[in-house]
UniProtKB/Swiss-Prot annotation:
Keywords: Cell inner membrane, Cell membrane, Membrane, Protein transport, Translocation, Transmembrane, Transmembrane helix, Transport
Keyword S-adenosyl-L-methionine: no
Topological relation to the membrane, as annotated: Multi-pass membrane protein
Molecular function in Gene Ontology: protein-transporting ATPase activity
Quaternary structure, from the entry: Forms a complex with SecD. Part of the essential Sec protein translocation apparatus which comprises SecA, SecYEG and auxiliary proteins SecDF-YajC and YidC.
HAMAP family assigned: SecF_B
Pfam families noted in UniProt: Sec_GG, SecD_SecF_C
Cross-referenced PANTHER family: PROTEIN TRANSLOCASE SUBUNIT SECF, PROTEIN-EXPORT MEMBRANE PROTEIN SEC
Subcellular location: Cell inner membrane
Protein's organism: Rhodobacter capsulatus (strain ATCC BAA-309 / NBRC 16581 / SB1003)
Upper lineage: Bacteria, Pseudomonadati, Pseudomonadota, Alphaproteobacteria, Rhodobacterales
Keyword field contains Protein transport: yes
Name of this chain's protein: Protein translocase subunit SecF
GO biological process: intracellular protein transmembrane transport; protein targeting; protein transport by the Sec complex
Transmembrane segments annotated in the record for this chain: 27-47, 152-172, 180-200, 207-227, 253-275, 285-307
Length: 333
């Protein structure tokens, strides 16, 4: 006998429009707040966006990240990230670590020029050899403010490019009203994540940008499922009011939406608890993104489409249907 876990019944009849203005209004308010908060409070940019120095160390003894971190704390270097590098090509007694240190206030340290850059490396080497005499610094490099500024703009353009591509896909797959609803939902998810990072002053670096891109993919996947069912129901229930068709479509896909979110959280929560500092920012953003993505799929995207309206009297067979037909039209009454 097969065991099936059901968090939500297959057939539900919730009225997702009952508190329409409250749920949609809350989303708009949070989006506006998420734009203002980073400007007022500021984001806690990581080394990728502030600039800093990366030091590569090598030792014949096993690496203890906690011991390394404790040894560097008296130096008061600010943001320090220590990670062990593993590679099958390494010898059995070859242990490599990467140490990333934020740009110091007393000097740029860019490209390791001058006494200041070398002084930083010497301080780190002295502190670490005290706890691991076999340790050697094999290389180091620095990222200056100019390069880190370019990384910020690259991150922004990558998010904008992803949004444009997704909007084009939804436009071709469905209609422009659906594309606009999906993009507003994506912007909602990204802005709320950035706003939360500003409020909590969590480290915002390239891994966070990767999480934002992943959130957009997760969110659009949820939204497309709802929109696809909505399109099928619009053909099936031609005389039903648009609001009722939308509510029916959300109810019919609710079980899938909840199960997808729960299974994703089952993988993310253990990583958030035991994954360590290196990936904690990425995982935290993803956990938050699961909730915002689910909320936007249910309460944001459909409200945009409802507000704009759909022309249900036009001919259903668009050119796009030739490429993306799922057979729903053939079996529709």
């Amino acid at each position: 006998m097969a065991f099936r876990l059901k968090l939500v019944p297959e057939k539900t009849n919730f009225d997702f429009f009952r508190w329409q203005w409250a749920t949609f209004g809350a989303a708009i308010v949070m989006m506006i707040a998420s734009v203002i908060l980073p400007l007022v409070i500021g984001l806690n940019f990581g080394i990728d966006f502030k600039g800093g120095t990366t030091i590569r160390t090598e030792s014949t003894t096993a690496i203890d990240v906690g011991v390394y971190r404790a040894a560097l704390e008296p130096l008061e270097l600010g943001d320090v990230i220590i990670s062990e590098v593993r590679d099958p090509s390494f010898r059995e007694d070859q242990h490599v670590a990467m140490i990333r240190i934020q740009m110091q206030e007393d000097g740029q340290g860019a490209e390791g020029q001058g006494a200041q850059g070398q002084e930083l490396v010497n301080k780190v080497e002295t502190a670490l050899t005290a706890v691991d005499p076999a340790l050697k610094i094999t290389s180091f490099e620095s990222v200056g403010p100019k390069v880190s500024g370019e990384l910020v703009w690259t991150a922004v353009w990558s998010l904008l490019a992803a949004t444009v591509v997704i909007m084009f896909y939804i436009w071709v797959r469905f209609e422009w009203q659906f594309a606009l609803g999906a993009v507003v939902a994506l912007v909602h998810d990204v802005l709320l994540t950035v706003g939360l990072f500003a409020v909590l002053q969590l480290k915002f670096d390239l891994t966070t940008v990767a999480a934002l891109l992943t959130i957009t993919g997760y969110s659009i996947n949820d939204t497309v499922v709802v929109f696809d069912r909505l399109r099928e129901n619009l053909i099936k229930y031609k005389t039903m009011p648009l609001r009722d068709v939308m509510n029916l479509s959300v109810n019919e896909t609710l079980s899938r939406t909840v199960m997808t979110g729960m299974t994703t959280l089952l993988a993310l929560v253990p990583m958030l608890i035991w994954g360590g500092d290196v990936i904690r920012g990425f995982v935290f953003a993803m956990v938050w993104g699961v909730f915002t993505g689910t909320y936007s799929s249910v309460y944001v995207a459909k409200n945009i489409v409802l507000f704009i309206g759909l022309d249900r009297n036009k001919e259903k067979k668009d050119p796009s249907d030739k490429f993306f037909s799922n057979g729903a039209q053939d079996g529709a009454p």
